[in-house]
Regions:
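Hydrophobic faces of well-ordered beta-strands that scaffold small-molecule active sites
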Residues: 13-17, 41-43, 69-73
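A short alpha/beta connector and helix-capping loop motif
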Residues: 23-55
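Acidic (Asp/Glu)-rich catalytic clusters
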Residues: 32-36, 57-70, 112
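Glycine/small-residue-rich loop that forms an oxyanion/phosphate-binding "nest" at active or ligand-binding sites
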Residues: 78-111
């Protein structure tokens, strides 16, 4: 049994958290303390949370700590933090995803991430 466990054991685990879970005057600077403990982050893309300034700050802080960056997409529901039901057609959902991932990619390109 030990031999089987050794062959299937996980050698590395990506310890991940969400960042930029704020917008405007509603800041959450405590979340940046997590950067010392994670290997990657998902940065909110501005629809359920995040705004351009918050997104930029989160990505730059992740870069400082050498933490990998991913996109945390969400529904266009900032008041409900993305938790309320949203009805979308398939092409609308696709556009929503492309738009949000594009925003993160643009920040990454602009700041050399």
């Amino acid at each position: 049994m030990q031999e089987v466990l050794e062959k299937k054991s996980i050698k590395n685990i990506d310890f991940n958290c969400d960042l930029a879970q704020a917008y405007g005057v509603y800041k959450n600077i405590q979340e940046y303390e997590l950067l010392d403990y994670v290997s990657s982050v998902n940065v909110s893309c501005g629809f359920h949370a995040g705004d351009p300034v918050t997104i930029k700050e989160a990505m730059l802080r992740a870069k400082e700590k050498n933490v990998a960056i991913g996109a945390h997409i969400g529904f266009n529901d900032i008041q409900g933090f993305g938790y309320r039901p949203v009805e979308l057609k398939e092409d609308e959902l696709e556009a929503l995803v492309v738009y949000q991932v594009g925003a993160i990619m643009s920040f990454a390109k602009a700041y050399g991430l």
